[in-house]
């Protein structure tokens, strides 16, 4: 297929997306391979190659003898048109072989708005969309990633899901498949064997029935299938696989830098944050391990920037020691050290001043809510005083721009909370007037608000999403209270967030709407150029579904939820306790201060989170 691919490259944007051949890509001899995996990222090359999870699992699979994992990305619209016109099937970058020729087709799901791309990539590959129509042991389709904590909207299309962290479970899945292939098992026999692995959910082994009002009545597992599927976790991150010799992209990507994962989980327990609950228990790498991995990665890639990735980087216990070690290496080489996910309540001016010697990065904070009452309700344990003090520290240190992120539509939010966002912005402006250095340049405040989506496995999973009309009313209320010229305010469009809520909170029937949307041409929904909400509304009409059933309808606390087959560690009782505290605007201390009994400890072999207080 290589010659055919090259003939159409001159007709598309960014042809480097489609050819592979990058430094450090892995190519193996086909005669040495007995399991081939097409690792599919359901978005463009630039997005997928920035994904740290994809880089990790690409390395994990290719370390296995007899296994060759190759990368596949969603084509942009111009390339898709050329592929269809020339009847070219979707191919893998390393070999240029069609995806339909692979043993396993694996998708990583990090964003619900990529679901339409999954169907489009299957169709472009020449594979049947519905799992029940794929009969043989070849072309088994499975998926992992954080979105799989509610796998049901994709249950009709995916043969099985890998729930939780994949470094160890992916190896077990491939060995299970290799054995099935050697033994000549049927697809159904293989799926039953795979279902015995911890963390594997096979949707065809579960029957969903519904009440007359549309709510779930029962989820019935087939004989031998577990009633609940427990997510997999990596117990020791210091010993876990982490790639320091990674592919160097041959075109610009979104995050063109080295990424270093410093810990998983989060001590904070913000009630809106799905990742904070789903990645528990908290586990961290040592500073020595991180320094070694960082230096090896930078020396191999030649990158001029490295990011310390986590949900809350400033909560890493050894941050000062880690930063010291990295800066000793980075400063003389003019390598920028980026610290995202900093919190206003533990911002270190000294650390930031040292980091800015190479390049001053932007200052970003996410207060999420405009008043202390609402911040307490969502358990965003940061005070207005801490926010203003942090800004004063930063402004006096030379920063003259700040990005602020908030959400609209949080449970219990009132107009007072919305206006409170504007009031906080003006207080920050006043702090600048009192503390800013280099005032000739003026202060720049970039303010963004998102339309809140209530995700599974959070204390707000039962809540109703506000209507799009109410969301826009609150947006306009905030706009009416913002007058300073230094403030650039942007807000998320409501249609996309509404559809995201359906996909995040939906049951198995949503798959029918997803299939109708695919037939109507929906794809690349995360991109403004392609998102067409009217087509989606038509898809729901054809499927006989009302999006409001999954969005503006609150779920009953006694209601059977679509994702109840999945066990992420955090218990329903804990989430209900946190929900009640939210309604009282009562905060919960972080895990480092006090163990709040979320249930995630039981997933750890040691029975403890790394951040748990001594007991």
Where are these regions (language model features)?
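Conserved SAM/AdoMet-binding glycine-rich loop
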Residues: 40, 113, 296-403, 408-446, ...
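N-terminal [4Fe-4S]-dependent radical SAM core
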Residues: 8-38, 45-46, 203, 209, ...
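N-terminal pre-triad scaffold of radical SAM enzymes
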Residues: 37-43, 61, 248-274, 298, ...
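Glycine-rich beta-alpha loop elements in corrinoid/cobalamin-binding modules
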Residues: 74-222, 459-507, 514-528
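Radical SAM enzyme core and accessory elements
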Residues: 1-27, 31, 37-39, 483-615
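Short secondary-structure boundary/capping segments
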Residues: 54, 86, 122, 156-161, ...
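Flexible glycine/acidic-rich beta-alpha junction loops that bind and position SAM and/or redox cofactors
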Residues: 77-78, 153, 207-211, 317-318, ...
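Canonical Radical SAM [4Fe-4S] cluster-binding loop centered on the CxxxCxxC motif
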Residues: 51, 252-288, 597-612
């Amino acid at each position: 297929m290589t010659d055919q691919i090259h003939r159409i490259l001159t007709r598309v944007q960014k042809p480097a997306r489609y050819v592979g051949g990058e430094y450090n890509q892995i190519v193996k001899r086909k005669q040495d391979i007995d399991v081939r995996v097409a690792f599919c990222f359901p978005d463009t090359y630039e997005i997928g190659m920035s994904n740290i999870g994809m880089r990790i699992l690409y390395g994990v699979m290719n370390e296995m003898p007899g296994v060759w994992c190759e990368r596949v990305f969603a084509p942009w619209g111009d390339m898709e048109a050329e592929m269809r016109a020339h009847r070219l099937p979707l191919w893998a970058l390393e070999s240029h072989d069609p995806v339909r020729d692979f043993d396993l087709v694996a998708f990583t799901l990090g964003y619900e708005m990529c679901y339409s791309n999954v169907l489009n990539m299957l169709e472009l590959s020449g594979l049947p969309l519905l799992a029940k129509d794929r009969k043989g042991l070849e072309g088994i389709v499975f998926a992992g990633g954080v979105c799989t904590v509610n796998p049901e909207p994709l249950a009709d299309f995916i043969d099985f899901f890998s729930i939780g962290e994949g470094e160890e479970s992916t190896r077990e899945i491939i060995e299970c498949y290799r054995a099935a292939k050697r033994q000549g098992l049927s697809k159904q026999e293989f799926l039953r064997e795979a279902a015995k692995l911890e963390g594997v959910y096979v949707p065809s082994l579960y029957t969903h029935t519904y009440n007359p009002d549309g709510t779930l009545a029962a989820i019935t597992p087939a004989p031998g299938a577990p009633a609940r599927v427990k997510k997999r976790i990596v117990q020791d991150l210091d010993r876990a696989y982490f790639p320091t010799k990674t592919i160097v992209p041959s075109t610009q990507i979104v995050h063109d830098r080295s990424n270093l994962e410093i810990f998983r989980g989060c001590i904070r327990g913000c009630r809106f944050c799905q990742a904070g609950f789903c990645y528990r228990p908290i586990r961290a790498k040592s500073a020595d391990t991180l320094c070694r991995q960082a230096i090896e990665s930078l020396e191999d890639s030649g990158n001029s920037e490295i990011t310390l990735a986590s949900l809350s980087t400033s909560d890493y216990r050894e941050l000062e020691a880690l930063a010291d070690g990295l800066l000793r290496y980075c400063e003389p080489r003019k390598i920028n050290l980026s610290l995202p996910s900093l919190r206003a309540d533990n911002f270190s001016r000294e650390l930031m001043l040292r980091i800015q010697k190479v390049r001053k990065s932007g200052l970003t904070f996410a207060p999420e809510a405009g008043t202390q009452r609402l911040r307490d309700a969502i358990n965003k344990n940061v005070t207005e005083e801490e926010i203003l003090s942090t800004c004063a520290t930063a402004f006096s240190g030379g920063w003259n721009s700040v990005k602020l992120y908030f959400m609209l539509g949080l449970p219990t939010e009132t107009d007072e909370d919305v206006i409170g966002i504007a009031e906080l912005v003006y207080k920050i402006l006043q702090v600048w007037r009192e503390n800013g250095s280099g005032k000739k340049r003026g202060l720049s405040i970039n303010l963004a608000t998102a339309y809140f989506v209530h995700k599974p496995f959070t204390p707000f999973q039962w809540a109703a999403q506000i209507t799009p009309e109410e969301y826009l009313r609150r947006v306009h209320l905030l706009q009416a209270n913002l007058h300073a010229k230094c403030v650039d305010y942007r807000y998320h469009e409501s249609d996309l967030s509404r559809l995201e809520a359906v996909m995040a909170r939906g049951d198995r029937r949503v798959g029918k709407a997803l299939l109708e949307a695919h037939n109507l041409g929906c794809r690349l929904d995360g991109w403004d150029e392609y998102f067409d909400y009217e087509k989606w509304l038509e898809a729901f009409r054809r499927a006989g579904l009302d999006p409001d059933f999954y969005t503006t309808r609150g779920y009953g606390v006694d209601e059977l939820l679509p994702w109840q087959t999945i066990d992420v560690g955090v218990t329903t009782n804990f989430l209900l306790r946190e929900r009640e505290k939210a309604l009282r605007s009562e905060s919960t201390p972080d895990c480092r201060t006090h163990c709040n009994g979320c249930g995630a400890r039981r997933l750890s072999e040691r029975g403890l989170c790394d951040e748990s207080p001594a007991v």
